[in-house]
């Protein structure tokens, strides 16, 4: 039979294993490579900008570098814009300012956390399989900081395209354009930001027809694989939520069983003590063997004697009356000569 300490140790080990499995089941977030918002950054490709593929839980730092000796400081105001605004390089309507690069003496760092639900009312929230755009319509000078049209978005294609939850190796940009016809805004941006040397409209139609044929060709097609990937990632959120809820329920059950076990053990110990007390009292009430009553049962009760004054005899002490008839212990007293005895002559 295992000791109580060993049982407690085994329960805690099981709980720690379950918590470790729950922790390993959650996706591992990572910090993406920081982006320096400068016209000298070679990552901003002409006609495309910078395209990244973050996942839910990742973090991205956008850095406004400090002024360097011999170079003028670049002033920018960064916006989170809609696809049509990124295509037109316009932030006139409903601008969402993220950060302002206007402090030459220090480096400004703005961190974006890709999360589906933000605890902050003004926090950013992102959805899987959606595209988000960051750009600036400033021209780099202090006078052009508040520009709402053109700027480095148009002259240097300084924009960040964030494809949340998407795999860069799964499908090509052309397949994304044809496989998601409901996202008209995304299609508009992709068409507007194509390089000038892409080819004619006929070539583009031919590519669309090829992609549509691949989508209809069966389970091995790219469109079917994309759908399977979408359903898999959509089910991961529900899976993680179910695992977390299961861990909480398991811990609550362990706590409940522990409290119940302690109560049962306490009640059992109380009953054992009561039975032991009753047995000791019955033993004390049994007469001695040399008094000529060897055949008397141990359960015989000594009846208290009363004096003529209707008082209990002081030589008898009551032990207990909670379990039946009162039991008294006879105190052995030395014989005394009676005080008031009259003899008839």
From Swiss-Prot:
Residues 169-227 are annotated as: Disordered. It comes from the Eukaryota. GO terms for molecular function: ephrin receptor binding. InterPro entries: Cupredoxin, Ephrin, Ephrin-B_Ecto, Ephrin_CS, Ephrin_RBD. Residues 25-236 are extracellular. Keywords: Cell membrane, Developmental protein, Differentiation, Disulfide bond, Glycoprotein, Membrane, Neurogenesis, Nucleus, Phosphoprotein, Signal, Transmembrane, Transmembrane helix. Pfam families: Ephrin. Inducible phosphorylation of tyrosine residues in the cytoplasmic domain. A motif (Nuclear localization signal) lies at residues 259-272. Residues 1-24 form the signal peptide. Residues 30-164 form the Ephrin RBD domain. Disulfide bonds join 64-101, 89-153. It is found in: Cell membrane; Membrane raft. Cell surface transmembrane ligand for Eph receptors, a family of receptor tyrosine kinases which are crucial for migration, repulsion and adhesion during neuronal, vascular and epithelial development. Binding to Eph receptors residing on adjacent cells leads to contact-dependent bidirectional signaling into neighboring cells. Shows high affinity for the receptor tyrosine kinase EPHB1/ELK. Can also bind EPHB2 and EPHB3. Binds to, and induces the collapse of, commissural axons/growth cones in vitro. May play a role in constraining the orientation of longitudinally projecting axons. This is Ephrin-B1. The gene is Efnb1.
């Amino acid at each position: 039979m295992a000791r109580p300490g060993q049982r407690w140790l085994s329960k805690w080990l099981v709980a720690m294993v379950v918590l470790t499995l729950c922790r390993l089941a959650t996706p591992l977030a990572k910090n993406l490579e920081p982006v320096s918002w400068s016209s000298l950054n070679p990552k901003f490709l002409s006609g495309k900008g910078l395209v990244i593929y973050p996942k839910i839980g990742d973090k991205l730092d956008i850095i406004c570098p400090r002024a360097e000796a011999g170079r003028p400081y670049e002033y920018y105001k960064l916006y989170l814009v809609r696809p049509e605004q990124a295509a037109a390089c316009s932030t006139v309507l409903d601008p969402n300012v993220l950060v302002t690069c206007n402090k030459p003496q220090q480096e400004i760092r703005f961190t974006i956390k890709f999360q589906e639900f933000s605890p902050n009312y003004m926090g950013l929230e992102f959805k899987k399989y959606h595209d988000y755009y960051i750009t600036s319509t400033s021209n780099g000078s202090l006078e052009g900081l508040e520009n709402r049209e053109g700027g480095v978005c148009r002259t240097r294609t300084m924009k960040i395209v964030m494809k949340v939850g998407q795999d860069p190796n799964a499908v090509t940009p052309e397949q994304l354009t044809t496989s998601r016809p409901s996202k008209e805004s995304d299609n508009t941006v992709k068409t507007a930001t194509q390089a000038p040397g892409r080819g004619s409209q006929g070539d583009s139609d031919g590519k669309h027809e090829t992609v549509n044929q691949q989508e209809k060709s069966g389970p091995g097609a790219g469109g079917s694989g994309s759908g399977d990937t979408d359903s898999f990632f959509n089910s991961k959120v529900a899976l993680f939520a179910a695992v977390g809820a299961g861990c909480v329920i398991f811990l609550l059950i362990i706590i409940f069983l522990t409290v119940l076990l302690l109560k049962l053990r306490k009640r059992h110990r109380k009953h054992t003590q009561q039975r032991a007390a009753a047995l000791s009292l019955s033993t004390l009430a049994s007469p001695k063997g040399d008094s000529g009553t060897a055949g008397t049962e141990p359960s015989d009760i000594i009846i208290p004697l009363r004096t003529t004054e209707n008082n209990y005899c002081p030589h008898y002490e009551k032990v207990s009356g909670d379990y039946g008839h009162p039991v008294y212990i006879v105190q052995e007293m030395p014989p005394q000569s009676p005080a008031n005895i009259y003899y008839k002559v």
